[in-house]
């Protein structure tokens, strides 16, 4: 579960960087 949460957080950060 922790690993999945980390992946989700990384995706969110990527979206923020793209904006």
From Swiss-Prot:
Positions of post-translational 4-carboxyglutamate modification: 11, 15, 18
Description of post-translational modifications: Gamma-carboxyglutamate residues are formed by vitamin K dependent carboxylation by GGCX. These residues are essential for the binding of calcium.
Residue positions binding Ca(2+) 2: 15, 18
Record: residues binding Ca(2+) 1: 11
Binding site for Ca(2+) 3: 18
Domain Gla: 1-19
Highest taxon, organism lineage: Eukaryota
GO biological process: bone mineralization; cellular response to insulin stimulus; glucose homeostasis; negative regulation of bone development; type B pancreatic cell proliferation
One Gene Ontology term of the molecular function aspect: metal ion binding
Cellular localization per UniProt: Secreted
Any one GO CC term of the record: extracellular matrix
Keywords (A to Z) from UniProt: Biomineralization, Calcium, Gamma-carboxyglutamic acid, Hormone, Metal-binding, Secreted
Family: Belongs to the osteocalcin/matrix Gla protein family.
Function comment: The carboxylated form is one of the main organic components of the bone matrix, which constitutes 1-2% of the total bone protein. The carboxylated form binds strongly to apatite and calcium.
Protein name: Osteocalcin
Source organism per UniProt: Halobatrachus didactylus
Gene of this entry: bglap
């Amino acid at each position: 579960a922790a690993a999945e949460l980390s992946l989700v957080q990384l995706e969110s950060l990527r979206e923020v960087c793209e904006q």
